[in-house]
Amino acid sequence: NANSSAIISNMGDYLDIKVDGKNTVKFNAIDVTVTDVRIYQPSFHLFGGKQTAAEVVIQHKNPMGDSLLVCIPVVAKDGKSASNSFFSKIIPNIASEDSSPQNVNVRQWSLNDVVPSATFYYYIGSYPYKPCSGKANIIVFGSEGAATMNSSDLKTLQTLIDPIKYTQAQTIGGA
C-alpha cells in the first residue's frame, strides 16, 4: 500500500501489529488472510544452531480456521534495504512500556518488505509462543532469507520488549 496504517501494541515480550486492509495470499491453493504480525527478540527458531536478533511471525487464517505462521529471521545489519526501512518506520514509534494499541501511520510500508523470495522450511507443529499448544502450518525462512534491521532499531526493540525465554524445541507435528 502506498499509504498504510498499523495498530501496534507493546505486549511486553513481543510487538503485536494489526495491519489495515485485507491482506490475502495463497497457501496450497487456498486463500489465507493475515490476522496479525508479531515481532519477538531474539528468534524462536535456531539458524545454524543459534538464535537470530529477532523473528517476525506473520499469522494467517483460512476460511476453515486453519492457521499458517510465516516466520522470518531478522539480523542486525545497518543499511537501506526494504526491510531496514520497514522496521525504521515502526520501531521508533512504539511506546516504551506495555501499552494500549497505538495507530501508526506509515508511508510506503508493506509486509512484502520483510517476506523474502527465498527457500523455506515447512512443518506442522504447535505454536512457538504461549500457550505453545494448538496446531499450525509453519513456514520458516532460512537465514539466507533473513530480513535486516538497523542496529539502532534493534537496540530500541531490545529496550521495548523482553527477550523470549528459549526452551527446548516444541514437538513437531505431534511426534
Predicted segments with their positions:
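Alpha-carbonic anhydrase
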Residues: N1-A175
